Regions:
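Acidic, low-complexity Ser/Thr/Gly/Pro-rich repeat segments typical of extracellular/periplasmic
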Residues: 24-252
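Intrinsically disordered, low-complexity serine/threonine-rich segments
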Residues: 8-11, 522
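Short, solvent-exposed coil/turn linker segments
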Residues: 2, 55, 119, 163-167, ...
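C-terminal motif of bacterial Sec signal peptides marking the signal peptidase cleavage site
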Residues: 17-20
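Bacterial N-terminal signal peptides that target proteins for export
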Residues: 1-9
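Ser/Thr/Asn(+Pro)-rich, low-complexity disordered segments
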Residues: 251-657
């Protein structure tokens, strides 16, 4: 009984204790909100530390382990400056009310201190409380950037390259991301011309307007440079800026306008003096270029021999002066280095010794030799055999042309070889094959009465048994022969300074059609301008071999470097008289201040890179004077074709003429 009483008492006490515990638990506070972390992007903010270099467009993400009471968030999560100025922000609660995102409504200031405060007003969904916390951050230092830049109302942001900017009125507007210090502003901005500039600041000193104080060069590339030393008024650094634009072409005629016929005569006369006045004084041959010193070129001098004929006929020199020069030229050709009758590409005009064109090309050059022979044959027909002195010159020319051993240059094969070296033999191993500028080499070889080649050498070697055929249409023009789009225009010049293409044809092509259409393809390609090079147009065209800003190259539609060579369009005048005459007027009147010099048109130009040659090359000068003459009178064509050996040679190869 007593034992039962004790047990009963224990049960009563236990019930009373449990009841008391439950009552006490119900009266305990609900608890505390647990914050997991605060992040800006991938960066976790730490209590008691200042997080630096945060972006000015940052959002703050707050993560909690508890479910929050959304109604308590506004007013409890705050972003303030260090002076307690509040930052208007958008606040979102999401992720089942366990996450808060605070995003400032405007970008924060650069290099400024801020504090993110979460106050005790924040509550959990079950009444949990939060003790409050604060995080310190500093924004990244600002960078001065260009928000907008225009030139004469054209966009000037890289990579845009504005064109046709009025060289007299340049107006560049630049808006920056921060205000500028007006002091010494002009020291940070420059145009490549180096001229003084006018500056105007506006829009709270964030916009600078630059204008020129004097005219810029026309048709030129001009750079705007903004120094990386520029800083904003707040001290923000700048990365620098460089871009360029092209000024518009001044179309005002640079020389008095004269009749076209007079202009053609002027061009011929100026070009003639390259071969006459600038010829090497010791030998009378043409220097390779205007900077080549004693180096004379055989091929270019062959063109120069034909230029002598034009000079006499046009009255630039007397016949006696021309014959005196011819006598000097022949004397040199008779005594200088020769190899099986052929000359080297380059010779020293003072001593007559070979100047290697390349280390292995130090002997005969049969193609260059053929250009000289073309000129000598043409001159031979111009001379008067009834005049004793001229008959002597004719005989000397025969001796020179008959000495060329074309048959030896076949090496017993049905093809001609281009080079031979006295110490390296056939090391160059270059066959002369078409279609290109070397047709005349096979023509003069076939006309030789002393060392001729058979027709099989032409058909198998040059024509490759028909492999030279093309037959495709480009821009609507059929191209009978050669590479796509025809290649450089010197293909239509060198062989045809003497060889008359007007009625020339064989089983492979009509050569008048070939040359006319290749010229028209070149013209059309240029004004179509698929590479958007500056300057190309219907009146500014012509791709051929010439100097260029990087050296020398054979420009063509398939090797377009942005370089226009006047000799290409000018020398095409026999094939494209309208297109060539338009180019001639443009080159002379519009570009003459840049393109016209002592010996006529300079070699080439590339306005895209601001390059204008000051060079003259014999092989570009020769086609100009000779092809203009063939257009005007057919003189050189008629002379060459009148040679009693030429037509039989052409007939042997299967040509009609």
């Amino acid at each position: 009984m007593k034992k039962y009483s004790l047990l009963s008492g224990f049960l009563v006490l236990n019930i009373l204790f449990c009841t008391a515990c439950k009552k006490k638990e119900a009266e305990t506070p609900a608890g505390t909100i647990q914050m997991a972390q605060v992040k800006i992007g991938p960066v976790v903010l730490k209590i008691g530390e200042t997080t630096k270099d945060i972006a000015v467009d940052s959002s703050f993400n707050l993560y909690f382990n508890n479910v929050l009471d959304p109604s308590s968030v506004n007013g409890s999560v705050l972003l303030k400056k260090s002076d307690n100025t509040g930052i208007p922000s958008d606040i979102f609660v999401f992720a089942d009310n366990r996450r808060i995102r605070l995003t400032p409504q405007k970008p924060l200031d650069h290099l400024a201190s801020y504090k993110l405060q979460v106050t005790s007003g924040l509550k959990g969904s079950n009444g949990e409380t939060f003790p409050g916390i604060e995080f310190l951050v500093v924004t990244v230092a600002g960078k001065l950037t260009i928000s907008n830049i225009t030139i004469n109302q054209q966009d000037f942001q890289i990579p845009i390259i504005p064109r046709n900017i009025d060289c007299k009125n340049v107006n560049i507007g630049i808006t920056f991301s921060d205000s500028l210090d007006p002091a010494n502003l002009n020291s940070f901005f420059s145009l490549s011309s180096g001229m003084p500039l006018k500056f105007v600041l506006s829009e709270n000193n964030t916009k600078v307007t630059i204008s020129n104080t004097q005219s810029l060069p026309d048709y030129s590339r001009c750079f705007l440079n903004i120094s990386k030393n520029l800083t904003s008024r707040s001290g923000f650094p700048f990365d620098g800026f460089t871009n360029y634009f092209y000024t518009a072409l001044d179309s005002t005629p640079k020389f008095p306008v004269i009749p076209d016929d007079q202009l053609l005569t002027l061009i011929q006369e100026k070009t003639f003096h390259y071969f006459y006045d600038f010829a090497h004084p010791s030998c009378g041959l043409a220097r390779e270029r205007n900077t080549s010193g004693d180096i004379v070129t055989i091929g270019g001098s062959g063109f120069g021999v034909m230029a002598l004929i034009v000079g006499i006929e046009r009255g630039f020199i007397t016949r006696d002066e021309g014959l005196t020069r011819l006598n000097k030229i022949l004397g040199f050709l008779e005594t200088c280095d020769r190899y099986h009758g052929a000359w080297a590409h380059w010779l020293n005009g003072a001593i007559g010794k070979t100047v290697p064109f390349t280390p292995n090309d130090n002997g005969a050059d049969l193609v260059e030799t053929s250009y000289m022979v073309e000129g000598l044959i043409t001159m031979r027909q111009y001379l008067d055999p009834a005049a004793l002195a001229e008959r002597s010159l004719i005989e000397r020319i025969y001796a020179l042309t008959n000495a060329v051993e074309y048959d030896w240059f076949t090496r017993g094969q049905n093809v001609l070889y281009w080079h031979w070296s006295p110490n390296l033999g056939w090391i160059m191993n270059m066959q002369v094959q078409g279609y290109n500028e070397t047709l005349i080499t096979y023509i003069v070889a076939a006309t030789s009465t002393t060392h001729p080649i058979p027709a099989s050498v032409y058909h198998q070697g040059y024509a490759k048994n028909g492999g030279i055929k093309n037959g495709s249409n480009y821009y609507g023009y059929k191209l009978p022969l050669g590479e796509p789009y025809g290649g450089p225009l010197f293909y239509t010049h060198y062989s045809y300074l003497g060889l008359d293409p007007r009625t020339l044809a064989d089983q492979y092509a009509n050569y008048w059609e070939q040359n006319v259409n290749q010229s028209l393809i070149n013209w059309t390609y240029c004004f179509t301008n698929p590479n958007s090079f500056l300057g190309y147009s219907k009146v500014c065209w012509g791709l051929t071999a010439s100097d260029n800003p990087w050296g020398y190259n054979a420009q063509s539609p398939t090797n377009d470097l942005g370089v226009i060579t006047p000799s290409a369009a000018v020398s095409a005048i026999a094939y494209t008289p309208e297109q060539s005459m338009n180019a001639i007027r443009f080159f002379y009147y519009t570009l003459g201040d840049k393109l016209w010099g002592e010996y006529g048109f300079y070699d080439a130009f590339d306005p895209s890179v601001g390059w204008w040659a000051d060079s003259y090359l014999a092989i570009d000068q020769g086609p100009i004077i000779c092809m203009i003459e063939n257009y005007r009178s057919g003189l050189l064509w008629n002379l060459f074709m009148s040679d009693p050996e030429v037509k039989p040679g052409l007939t042997k190869l299967g040509f009609t003429y």
